[in-house]
Amino acid sequence: MSLGLLCCAAFSLLWAGPVNAGVTQTPKFHILKTGQSMTLQCAQDMNHGYMSWYRQDPGMGLRLIYYSAAAGTTDKEVPNGYNVSRLNTEDFPLRLVSAAPSQTSVYLCASSY
């Protein structure tokens, strides 16, 4: 690839600007003491039916915690320590009932058709 073409491609990407991913997860990070509870919020604005919560432990791949195929329905994969609700299409909050050291992880929310 010529240097001129490479510079043109890089310049074009600079003008693209930030893109909304359509899924928002808050808070971005949080530290809890053992026994504390908290709710991780997940919202999507793409009218997707499916929403999922995953966790990724250090050195491991993603593991499904909960999923929902539509508002009003939920199914769990990891049975202990979590609660969810899906009252509408947009929101799928995950509640850690009582934080334990075994729940130290990165939590990720996703949505799809």
Swiss-Prot record:
Could you tell me where this protein is found in the cell? Cell membrane
**InterPro entries from the entry?**
Ig-like_dom, Ig-like_dom_sf, Ig-like_fold, Ig_V-set, TCR_beta_variable
Answer yes or no on keyword Glycoprotein. yes
Bridged cysteine pairs (disulfide) = C42-C109
| GO terms (BP aspect) | adaptive immune response; cell surface receptor signaling pathway
- Is Secreted there in the keyword field? no
Its name, as the record gives it, is T cell receptor beta variable 6-8
Show the taxonomic lineage: Eukaryota, Metazoa, Chordata, Craniata, Vertebrata
